[in-house]
Amino acid sequence: FRINEIFLKRLIQIYKPSYIYCAKGKIKKNNLYNSILKYKSYNLLKRSNEEIEIINKDLMLLMSTSGTTGSPKFVRQSYLNVSSNTQNIIKYLKIKSKDITITSLPLTYVYGLSVINTHLFVGATIVLTNYSMVEKKFWDLFSTCKVNNFSGVPYNYSIIEKISKKGLPSSLEYTTQAGGKMNHVLIKNIINIYKKNK
């Protein structure tokens, strides 16, 4: 997700976030934010104690979404929103501490973040990777770590349909899908691919 620098600066001025996770160099060095963690090409920045101003004590997160218009918007989520959503998904999917998932969606995407939240909440395992689903190393890691659940949008499943002629890793127990309607032919093909190793 690319964001205009002027727009980003304005968001920071308005919301004064305690933490910012961004690409290195996206936020110019200043006295308000210090880098506390570096991972590959990303930085986690923490706001210094100066000028901390609480806008809304319930506000936890601003998530970017393009919605139906294609123009970026930010949705405010409270601690209660995130907590309720996390617990409802856990209850519905029966996610347990023994579960193992893999990052296949961007963490800046609501669905990708909910996969992280739900698994962390129950003490499950999350396999973090920068490998793309089209890389053999992604599927090797999937098998080696015995990943048992996978989350994706229709595009992820269209990739699986194209590259998984031999079937999916035998450790896979279930998948979840969001982010748009999947056509019936793709659903049928994914089920058939899943059955090959069962």
Label the model's feature ranges.
Residues 36-59:
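Flexible, low-complexity linker/hinge segments
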Residues 127-129, 150, 188, 192-198:
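Conserved ATP-binding loop and adjacent catalytic segment of the adenylate-forming AMP-binding
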Residues 60-87:
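Conserved AMP-binding A3 loop
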Residues 1-10, 24-26, 124-145, 155-156, ...:
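ATP-dependent adenylate-forming carboxylate-activation enzymes
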Residues 22-27, 145-189:
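Adenylate-forming
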Residues 59, 65-68, 101, 107, ...:
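Conserved S/T- and glycine-rich ATP-binding loop of Class I adenylate-forming
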Residues 56, 97-98, 172:
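Phosphate-coordination loops involved in phosphoryl transfer and adenosine-cofactor binding
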Residues 83-100, 110-149:
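Conserved AMP-binding/adenylation subdomain of ANL enzymes
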